[in-house]
């Protein structure tokens, strides 16, 4: 059992930086997620949305809503309201011309808010798969 240090922020992300231009990193991220059984259910172009709604300019930035249906079904069977926390968001954002940051929400941290211990194993599985997807990104540089 781990305990948070008072005053310390709990990490809620899994992240990596890749030496790929943004568009190629988005493509590689989609493929890496698919290799781990995740489908992308939603896609929000945050840069375009902020430009259209509040005329703000930010670097290219997309939010992919990733879901592994088998895990979602197991989670819903154990916690009817879990849909409020689905899908797992994966963010791809430009960090210059040739570097891109890829971040995913940590499913284990996310389900901790439910205080439902039955979700821990499901969240751990999702975390392992997201870790593997992000770890595979450097291999997609070629």
Tell me what each language-model feature is.
Residues 39-41, 45-91:
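Compact, glycine-rich, soluble single-domain proteins
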Residues 7-36, 135, 139:
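Terminal, regulation- and interaction-focused segments at domain boundaries
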Residues 89-116:
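Beta-strand/loop substructures that line and gate deep hydrophobic ligand-binding cavities in soluble
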Residues 112-142:
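Well-ordered alpha/beta subsegment
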Residues 10-12, 34, 56-59, 95:
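Short glycine-enriched loop/turn motifs at secondary-structure junctions
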Residues 30, 47-48, 131:
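Short glycine-/small-residue-rich flexible loop motifs, especially phosphate/cofactor-binding loops
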Residues 20, 24, 45, 125:
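Conserved active-site and cofactor/substrate-binding residues in soluble primary-metabolism enzymes
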